[in-house]
Every structure is written in structure tokens, then in C-alpha cells.
């Protein structure tokens, strides 16, 4: 019974709980239903009300359009209130348009005060309501201006309408109510206008105008009419003028308006009178004063970011170009503002692509977001930026430099009269063309004389200007060449800047700048920026000048000045390296080194091609080669950097010794040197004399790099298939190598051609006719590398431009194909450079950007650029044509052949080993010294066989004939007769392998069996079997061996030897 009672009670409680919850849910449903019904009724009521109001408004404007009498201002006011009550910008834009037109029509009414919409502002009851209403209407206009697209015709009409509304009600000048007696109301109404303008500014008027102007102007063809542009710019200027140019309004004007892409350029062409307004308000001066403050300038740049900061710079520069006199007065502030803006952009300029960078057409890789909408304006922006390096601005900024005189203690240099040119000078058509014109000024030889205080106002001013241009070079990376070309436009700027540099400090430029390297002060950085600018500009100028302009016309720099400059640079770079400054250099220090070193190497390479500096000019006498080698052995970084960057400061002979030591060390490391405990691996090859090139190619091309560097033994097989007698102890391989090189470099094979004139070798453009021609070139490279590796000199004279490519010079950004062109074809070079100096119109010559070549009887047209055969050569592109043509002839035509040969050569010779040599020095490394043969050195290192000795009469006669009777050319022929190379080894005959040898022979070569006891004794005691007067001297070039009969008379020896070397009867193997 107790259990049943408990169960019933629980069931009853649960039932009551469920009923209570259901009642609560029902009440919530009813409450929600009421709320929803109220919302729906409210929505439907509002929709009916809005529909009724819109209907009323539509009827109002329909009646207005039907041509009935003009509506009163009060009617417009009331209908405007109703419209503003329900206005949605997207839905009611057409009604808002009609309202604006009605308001503007009312303002145009003549002598009808009740019609003028503005008259309501004078009603005490309506003044505040009217002001509130016009503010609302005008802001709706602003919102629509931010959405409309000016390139669409209908939108452009609406833009004109809304701009007219804004212009009309932010200034009282067009209000007819103020005519006559109403003039007394102007102050009050001006106050109202100022209030309206202040409200719009707070809501974001400047942002709206920026969007409108950018949309209308940042495109290939601007789509804002003169009226639109004038209205928008007037609106932007009004608040600033009204606030008397306060900083609070100058800031948004600069940030939102002056940063519109190429705004000033468009104003100058579309609405030039607006620029007159800017000038009347002295706005440029006010911009400069505002931006020269570091904090305000940084704030503006951070608000704009890099892309729009460039736009602001462009507009300021354009304004400056129109007000040069003002710039003279405000130069310091102008330079400071531009430098700060460039420095801000520079922080985000990246050296290479990454996930965090974006491409900018002027700044390059940029780590801030890039507004690609500006790309269409970039041409005009760049044109505006060009005012920075245009001649008028350069003349103003560098006026102190250009007008200055050298200090009294600078000694004048004698001036050599230059022959006058019969050609008349044409008008300058471009900056680049002007860089080639001859300077008429007479200057002094410049020496580091010192005497100008570095803390003087003049020096600080020049330093600030140099910092500006140097910052522009490192920031505007994609138009760097344009900047350099502009800065080198004036012939006398760089020489006078160099004179200024020489006069800095108490002892002259070098000591001062070396001290600056160790001082991390602002003054030191500015001085070093001046040096960097000078180096960058001078390097650019010398790179684009040809030899005639450098050596004969001596444009900008006299040769004596180049000697002085190169001496300064050589010392400066060496000190930077040797004092450890370069080892850990980064940032500005690294840029300084690259700048100074780049200018130094351009001068050095120019001197290597055609000397202007005295002998041993490039050597550093305070650098002892022994000390350098010791530091290299200890792996000291500074010694390695000297060889990497300025190897020319070390005497050539020492560098050759270093090269040979590098080879020896590698051989030891690879186990290629005979030791007491091990012998190197030997590769044996068998070569048929009749197919020497083919067999050598087949057997050696597959060898590994290690095997090619190792010992290779050659066994020759004669035409009958019989092995030739003799053991190869490097001599036979030397003959094989020389014979291979002789055959592959024979122009008749068409792997190589010779240049016109001096007949130097380079890859043949038509060598592709050979099967597997690229593999052949790689094999040739390996053979040439093997010869250099083993110290075997081969008589292979290469064209200078080809040697430059072997050294990798053509990869340098300062490499000029035109400079190397004379080494390929001097006549072709003269013809090309004559185009640069052509008096008439280049287009009359009928040239195109193409090159026609006769290839095996067929005329082939090579386009220098895509579509080049249809692009005529004009005065504007003739410089490009010259460089393209030179690059095609020396690089494009033989690119694959050159790459294959260099690949083979570098598989034997490491690139870093030969980078310490110049182009002529590399030729000497390959072919031996071009100095006259040192007979005493040769005599000292000669080995005698067959009874000959140093006091033997035949040997005495031989040396006397070589010294007294033979000409230098005949001595070279004699050396080639014995060694197969007409030049002595670079380090002297002590390094000739095998050593130079002379052996007494009594029989012909086919009967010669070598030295026997009898033959040696007969030779020693001058005993002859028979008179050898009818026999000629012979040689075994593979052993550097001269076989000399035991002649009885000196005259016979002289006659036979001269005949033998002229017939070149060498290449015989005993």
C-alpha cells in the first residue's frame, strides 16, 4: 500500500510540472506572435509610408518637369525633408538627382528671392533645419561621388551635378541673394558655408575627392573633364584656404589630394588656371615648410605608404619645376622633404622576390602592398619624377658646385689642342645623346689638395643634395639608369664634384674618407654618400662612352684626371679590404664598397683594353706578396678578398705563381702527384696519327673530371697500324695536346673563325654544321683547360671579347658589348659608332633593328628584338641599336658554342683561379709571355745531350747567333721551332716542362737511336763521322728538344738554323 501511494504522488507531481511548462511555452508563443505581428505591421506600415512618400516625391518632380511655374524654396525644402526621411542612397539615387537639379535650378532663378533655395537660411524658424538639411544632402552627394565611375557617360553627368552642388553650397560667390543690398549678409552666410565645409571635412570629404580624382586620372586617358577637375580641386582647396593653411587641414590636403597620381600633370594640361591659384596662395612653399618637419613628413608617408608617397613626390617635383625661383629660396627644405620621403620608401625596397614582396614598376620588389591601380599612371608619375634629375633642377641644386672655382693651389694642367671636328652639332634630342657630346671647358688636373672645412655650410649643403640623389638611386631601382643619365648630362658637373671632393678636409679627400669609414656619425655618412654618388655617376658615364670619346675627345674627364681618380679609388678600396672593413660589411658600408669598387674596376678594365695609366700604376707597393701569400696560407679573409676583388694590386708574376701553387695543391689533394708511398692513376689512350682529333675526342670526352686532371699517357699508331717507338714521359702527351689544339683551332675546320685585322680566334657562328658541335666545343674547352692546368703554353691567340666571356666579365651590369666590339671587327665598330655621330636623320639610312648575314650563300635576317625587321632605327633608338648589334655579334650568335667551351674549360680550371687575371693576362697564361725572349734565362735552364755542353763551340755559336744575328721575330720563330710556342713561359724557362734541351746528332732523324757512348764522346771532342753541312737542325717539340748537327762553321749553323725555323721543320718524334 505504501509503495502504491508513493508512485501515485510522483506521477501527480510530474504531471503538474509538465502542465506548467506547457503553459509557459504557450505564453511565450503568444508573446512572440504579438512581437512578430507588431514588427510586420510596423514594416508594412513603414513600407506603405515610404511608398506613399516616394509617390508624392515622384509626383512632385513629375509636375516640376512638366514645365509648370517654378517651385518655391519652401516647397523644395519640404519635399527634401520627406526624401531625406526615407532616403537610401542606392534606391533613391534618381530622386536625389532630381532634388539636386531642382535646388540648382532654384539658385539660377533671376530676381526671385522666394525661389532661391538658400533664402531659407535667412528665415529664423528654418535656419537650423535648412543647415541640417543641406549638410545631409551634400553628404549624400559625397557618398554617390565615391561610387560613380567617371569613365561611364551617365555617371560622368551625375558627377558634374553633385560636384556643382558641393561647389555651390560651400562658397557664397555664386549666390544671387547677395547681390546689391544682400552684400551685408555675406559674412553670416560665409560663416554658414564654413560650417557646412567643416561638417563635410569631418565626414570624410577629402577621402571622397581622392577616390574620385584617382578613378578619373589614374588611367591611360583621363576621363575627368575640365569642369569636373576644376570643381574637385577647388573643393579640396577651399577648406585649406578658409583655415588659413593650418596644419590640421594641410595634412589631409597633402595626403589625399597631392598624392593623387600625376595630379599636377593633369592640371597643367586640362585646367592650368588651377595651378595659377596654387601659385597665388604660395602653396608649394607651404608644402615644403610642412613636409620638411621630420615628424609631419613621417606621418604623411606612413598614411600614404610607398606607392602614393611616390605620387606625392612627383606632384611636388612638377610644381617645383614650374617655380624654380622659389626652389632656390627653399632649397634646403625641398631637399630635406624629398630625402625623407625617399628614405621612407627605401625601407621597404627589397633586393629580391619573396613571399612578402610585390613588384612595383619604379621601386622594384617592394615589401609593402602595391596599388596596381596606379600602373596606368606610372608613365606620367615617372615623367614627374624625372624633374628631379632634369637639367634645370640640377643646375639649381648644384649651383655652388657648377659655379665654383678651384682653390688657388691647384696647379693647372697643360691643355693639348684637340683637332676641330668638321661636323656641326645637332640639337640635343635626349639625355642619353647629350652624355656623348664634347665638353668645351678647360679644367685643371685634380689632386687631393685639401683645404675646405667639412663643417662649413657649403659642404653640408652639397652633402645633403648628394644624399638626396644617392637615396633616389637606391630607392627608385627600376629607373636607376635614367637618374644616372640625367646626372651625367652636364659635362662639367662630375669633374667639379671631384675637385670639390679633393679639397675636403685638411689633407685632401682620401684621408678624410678613410677616417669617415671608422666614424658612425651623420656627417661621415653624408660625406660617404657624396663619394658614392660621384662613383656611381662617373662609372655610368665611362661605361656609355666609347674609346674615341674617352681617349681622344676626353669628354668630362681628362686622362690625367682618370689617373688621379683611379689612384684614389685603388687606395681606398685596398684600405677598406685590408683594414677589415669589408669583411663584415652590410647596409650602407657594403653599398659604398660596391660603388667605389665598381667604378675602380670599370677604369681598370678600360685601362687593360687601352692603356691610359702609367706602368705599375695599379700595384700597391705597401702590399708585400710574401705577406699576402702567408695570410692566404692561414686562410685570412682579407687576403682572400684582395684576390677576389682587386687582384691587380699584386704583381702579375706573383699571381701566376699563386695560380701554379693552387694547381699543385689540388693535384696533391686529388692524389695526382707521385709520392714515396703511392703513384697516381694513369690513363692510357691509343691515338692513330691519321685520326688524331677523332680518336682523342672519342677517348677523352668520356673521362671523368678527376681522370682528365690526372696523368694521361699517349701511344701513337702510325698509318700502317704499327705502334710508334718511344715512351711518353709527358712529352708525347704534350705533342698530342699541341697537335689537337692546332687542328681544332684551324679556321679551315670552321669550329673557330679569326677576327679581321689581327686574326684572333673566336667560336664560329656557323660551327653548328658539325655533328655534335657543342660536345666538340666542350672537348676543346677541356683540352685548353688541361694545357693551362699542366702549364703547357699553346700558341692560340683569342679575341679579347671572347677572353672576357671566359672570365665572366659579360655578366657584370657594367659590361658594354660596344667596348669589346673592336676586338671582333674594327671596321664594323667604326661603322656602328659613325651612326651615333651621324649628322642627318638616321631614318634616312633605312636601317631596322635586324642584322642581315650571308650564311653559306643564303641571306639570313636576324631580328635584334621581336619584330625588329619592321622597326626602323631612329635618332631615339640608335644607341639601343648599336648595343643590340654589338651584343648579337659577340654573344647571341655564339652563345651556345661559348657556353660549351667555357663549361669544358671550367671542368679543369676553377673560375676563381683565373678571375685574378685580366683579359690580356689570361691570354698570357694560355700562350705565354709576350715579352721578348730572355736568352740568358733560356741559356741558364738549358739541358745538353750527345756530348754538347755550355762551352762547346757549336753551343757558343748558337747563343751568339741568337743574341747578335737574329731579330726578335726570328728568336720567337726559333722558340716556336723547338717548343711549338713562340712565347716564353710566364714565369721564365725554369717552368718550361720538359726543360729546353739541345742534343748533338750525327745522323738523320729516321736513323737516330738516341745517345750512345760513341756519339757522346764524338760530340764532346768535336769528332765527326762526316761533314754534316748538308743537314738541317730538327726538333722534337714534345720534348722541347733541339737536335743540332755538329757544324764546323758558325756561318753554316746560322744559315741552316735560319732556314730550318723559316720552314718550321719541327714536330718530329725520335
From Swiss-Prot:
Disulfide bonds: none annotated. It comes from Mus musculus (Mouse). Gene3D superfamilies: Hect, E3 ligase catalytic domain, Hect, E3 ligase catalytic domains. One of its GO terms (biological process) is regulation of postsynapse assembly. E3 ubiquitin-protein ligase which accepts ubiquitin from an E2 ubiquitin-conjugating enzyme in the form of a thioester and then directly transfers the ubiquitin to targeted substrates. Ubiquitinates BCKDK and targets it for degradation, thereby regulating various metabolic processes. Involved in the positive regulation of neurite branching in hippocampal neurons and the control of neuronal spine number and morphology, through the ubiquitination of PPP3CC. The modification N-acetylmethionine is found at residue 1. It is an enzyme of class 2 (transferase). This is Ubiquitin-protein ligase E3B. The lineage of its organism: Eukaryota, Metazoa, Chordata, Craniata, Vertebrata. The active site is at 1038 (glycyl thioester intermediate). PROSITE patterns: HECT, IQ. Its EC number is 2.3.2.26.
